């Protein structure tokens, strides 16, 4: 399996979000931070596997990531990167060529885009793909488990699902523990401390019309919130919705011949 998406991103042919691209290929979130904080962040991922399912990490300074894809370069193959300084988003850039240093470690985390394709195959509509928008994301009233300087609230993504298909969506997504797994909650958003679904903290609004039930999954923005709390001098992530598309099969990236 080989995806042409990274090459298209690198050449500037594709600059938007990656929802619905390269069906069958695993999409991952990126977190890039100084090596001095890598162990603590790895522990944070282990303590919070739903929002931070760790797929793989690099050695310090490593830019080529052949384990994830042929010719893949972590500095250039994501449509947009967010750069944080002292916990504050300072800028968004199309590549990291001017911001890279040899002490940086990159983490790849699984993401819920992976199971969206499975939902579609099962006849369950995915609104953000149908409307070509970024899935809405919300900060909740639940806290993650801390490790070192890393702590913060759980962030969730929301997809409206027809009421008759909510249970099926739950069962399908539960088959992908490396990509958020089963939903955190379905139904009343106030249970999660979300007052207004029309005011997402990240992404685009998605109406819960036509009998749609709001279904919430743990989201890859959770570690971004933890990074902001940590106030590191420098850390880098993907821009929400703008993922790294790998060559790994999304249905089982850990099978023999892929990751061990």
UniProtKB/Swiss-Prot annotation:
Pfam families membership: D-Glu_cyclase (PF07286)
Keyword flag Acyltransferase: no
GO biological process assignments: glutamate metabolic process
Keywords from the named record: Lyase
Disulphide bridges: none
A molecular function GO annotation: D-glutamate cyclase activity
Domain of life: Bacteria
Cited Gene3D superfamilies: PSTPO5379-like, PSTPO5379-like domain
EC number: 4.2.1.-
Sequence similarity: Belongs to the D-glutamate cyclase family.
NCBIfam families for this protein: PRK05463.1 (NF003969)
Classification via HAMAP family: Hydro_lyase
Annotated protein name in UniProt: Putative hydro-lyase Dshi_0610
Classification of source organism: Bacteria, Pseudomonadati, Pseudomonadota, Alphaproteobacteria, Rhodobacterales
